[in-house]
Amino acid sequence: MSDSVDKKFEEEWKIEINEWIESLEAVKESYGNKEVKELLRSLQNFALSQGITLTEATLNTPYRNTIPLSEQPSYPGNHELEDKIENIIRWNAMAMVLQAYDTGEGLGGHIATYASAATMTEVALNHFIKSRTENYQGDMMNIQAHASPGIYSRAFLEGRLTKDEIGNFRRELQDAGGLPSYPHPRRRPELWPSPSASMGLNGVNSIYYARFAKYLENRGLLKKSPGKIWAFLGDGEMDEPETIGTINIASREQLDNVIFVVNCNLQRLDGPVRGNGKIIQELEAVFRGSGWNVIKVIWGSEWDPLFAIDTNDVMQRRMDEVVDGEYQNYSVSSGADQRAHWIQDNKELESIMSNLSDDELKDIKRGGFDRKKLYAAFEKAVNSKGKPTVVLIKTLKGYGLGEGSEGRNIAHQKKTMSDEERIEIGDRLGIPLSDQEKKDAAFYVPDEKSEEMQYLHDRRKELGGYQPIRFDSCKSIKAPDIELFEDFTNGIDRSISTTLVLVRMISKMLREDEIGQYIVPIVPDEARTFGM
């Protein structure tokens, strides 16, 4: 076809698409969302009956936020105070690792992970994750292990950890005490509910905790309203077979009490997670295919006016085309370079993007740093019924650490900084320390009567208490006397099946007054084969 014929077809096809969209809008206004879904299903089924296979249309939604602006609730928090608190926690988390490195003992830690996860963690802790109360069982918060400095930093502000303890990060045996690198209840039994440092352990642990909690709930064994299990994970961590391999259990058991929050900063320990792909889209397909509720938080509020004028979806198509490696390159490129690569030769897209200056384009936020978008996602997650929820949040590794770290492949291994970097970051975060104190990575705590500290404590008080926390108020159980097993300890004069002995021992323990009521035999299929 000639160029003129091509152009005519393009214009006619655009009109055709717009007419279909207008028709769909009319159906929505007249009948509602449910009927729109039914109509689309019918159209898809008809296409399939005609031999047209829609391979890409079933498990992926466009590369944009799941919750549209029209359905976004208002944010209940104080942005100014939450900014200040988050910045203080960011500073102290970074200072903790820098002080450990400055000892010259070869110690380090992870700075960049919490830098990317700080905003989502703070929104969750200020507004959603509840502690145990008289009528509520309490939520469980299992964190992304490399983000532990941020949790320690918050606990320090809350008064749950001392200055000596956080000053001895990775040096637990110091006389004044110290802190372990990663979460484990054996190391800090009052803080960490579950170990999460081994890659893949956090997800599977959280699912099985949620399953057990649902077991207790379904049998009326909980005296309080059941809580949620929150698992904060990294996108690289999602490649672990233990994580993905257990998600079907959560959907099959209808575990609407588990929420996965995946920090998609697009980088793993040693480079990109999916340089030539899109990890968020990949995970969306995996989780939707497994029956999970999927919520994506990709773009910040600055994009909303651009979506409003993107009537022909040219910007959306570009968002869908660009791969993670290119998005990461944008994070280390100037606004002008981003614009040139993003627009290419598309005049309509150029017109849309002209609403942003190069500086605005450079500084535009990913969804993981927008409290409004995060709040909307978490609110929908906690109200999900009948199925588990995963929230896929796009962030930037090393966010706020300056051009030497943000989005760069070396960000994960960043353990130290120059004096100039420390001062520059402290200034940007608004930390009121002297330049020398910033060089020394000194900790900062506001006055206990300050607005920031009052807000910090009030928010946790409103949610029942501090988190994360491990509840260990369990009844002590007396072990049965050895006489209970004398049939086995005395021995017999013939060989006997170990399976038979096991069954008899369990039977005796089930009849024992002290412990019998706490034993729950879980019988696998093989039990029938073995005569159990």
Language-model regions, residue ranges each:
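Non-catalytic terminal/interface segments that mediate subunit docking, oligomerization
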Residues: 67, 72-93, 114, 129-132, ...
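Cofactor-/ligand-binding subdomain signature composed of acidic, glycine-rich
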Residues: 16-19, 23, 42, 55-101
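Glycine- and acidic
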Residues: 6, 23-26, 74-82, 100-109, ...
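Long, well-ordered, tryptophan-enriched scaffold segments
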Residues: 264-493
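Short internal beta-strands
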Residues: 141-144, 257-265
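Amphipathic alpha-helical packing elements
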Residues: 13-53
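Residue-level marker for buried hydrophobic side chains located in beta-strands
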Residues: 231-232, 260, 522
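Cofactor-binding active-site loop characterized by glycine-rich and histidine/acidic residues
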Residues: 77-89, 93-105, 110-253, 276-277, ...
